[in-house]
Amino acid sequence: MIRIVVSGAAGRMGRRILELVQGDAETTLVAALEAESHPLVGQPVAALAADVPADKPSDVRVASAPDAGLAADVIIDFSVPEQSIKVAALAAERGWAVVVGTTGLDAAQKQRLAAAASKVAVLTAPNFSLGMNVLFQLVAEAAHRLPGYDIEIVESHHRFKKDAPSGSALRLAERAAEATGRDLSKTAVYGRHGLPGERTTPEIGIHALRRGDVVGEHTVTFTTLGETLELTHRAHSRDAFARGAVHAAKWLAGKPAGQYTFEQVLGI
């Protein structure tokens, strides 16, 4: 049985991951973590996860920190960058593998994740859905096969998302840039306004929409004079991401220290 800690347990993703971990025959929930100031700290996880099998009751309560002697195999974190860094440091100290689904980390924060990976297995991904990860591959292939086409990326998420553009949109741009030998730091254009002038071929446009309760939509277009190829992924619910994160945690358990990707989990 794989022992799992969930960090960011009261968040939209955290709640669903709690349910999936408790409902999986191969995993058991050993801790659920939230910010110290969160009103649900001290409450049973049943207050967060309603869809749990009756034969797998849990006595776990939401806590701001794990017990000193807690035995665990993997911690799954979907929170905010500042918390994710603390979680990675905690995992390195305790010897737990860590799955990080938080996006919006800056360069310094990514370096701290890399430091944790020198001690434990660390898996980071901008998106844990199978379909989206296939889209990463398709975009790289299309960019390679369609040199000179104008590449534009449009992502849409719910009004509550804090970072923009999404980590998935940035990964799509990275894959397109890698496939065409471009330096994304020099060719990325984040939205347009005013009089930017004519579009240049090396540009990769990245645009973010925030509206309602959209779970996640990403469209990449490759356009030249006379035609457009459009590739789109739409998430219908957070289950696509939550199931992928739990699958990644099960795969990561027992792996040696190092940095891992969800593409490795999927074998693509």
Model-found features: residue ranges?
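Nucleotide donor/acceptor-binding cores
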Residues: 2
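Rossmann-fold NAD(P)-binding glycine/threonine-rich loop
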Residues: 82-94, 101-122, 133-141
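Hydrophobic, well-structured mid-protein blocks that either form specific transmembrane helices
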Residues: 116-161
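N-terminal Rossmann-like NAD(P) cofactor-binding module of classical short-chain dehydrogenase/reductase
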Residues: 75-76
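Short glycine-/small-residue-rich Rossmann-like dinucleotide-binding loops
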Residues: 79-80, 103, 208-210
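An anion/phosphate-binding loop that grips the pyrophosphate of nucleotide cofactors and donors
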Residues: 72
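C-terminal substrate-binding/catalytic lobe of Rossmann-fold NAD(P)-dependent oxidoreductases
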Residues: 5-7, 12-69, 147-268
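Short gly/pro/ser/thr-enriched loop/turn and capping motifs at secondary-structure boundaries
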Residues: 38-39, 105-108, 129-132, 160
